[in-house]
Amino acid sequence: MILISGYLDYRPEECDEVVAGLVEVSKRSLEDAGCVDYWWAADLETPGRFRFFECWESEEKFAAHRSQPYEVEFMERYVNNRAIGADAWAYDPSSRRSAMDD
């Protein structure tokens, strides 16, 4: 399993168009083989910042996702050519358990 988290920053006046792109990439990503979870959320304290979280069954499934044409297009259009700030981190958890257990 691999977890990815991070953020992308945009100019506030671009956010409506960016949200449309985030909705589309989310829908398609959730359909990819090996996608356990995938979401975006507007940062409540930083205007124009969107945080993301992804969970994939394996590094291989994540790599396959990154090579999908829609993902390549998203990265080019909304990250490489539009984001004014960005960072992301990958985590490789060694175990998984419920955080709701007593």
Predicted regions and their residues:
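Glycine-rich beta-strand-turn "strand-cap" elements at beta-sheet edges
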Residues: A41-T46, M75-D102
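N-terminal first-folded block
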Residues: I2-D32, V36, W40
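Non-catalytic surface loops within mature trypsin-like serine protease
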Residues: Y10-P12, S58, D92-S94
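An amphipathic, aromatic/His-enriched active-site/gating alpha helix that lines ligand/cofactor pockets
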Residues: E24-V36, C55-W89
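Short, well-ordered beta-strand segments in beta-rich or mixed alpha/beta enzyme
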Residues: I2-D9, W39-R66
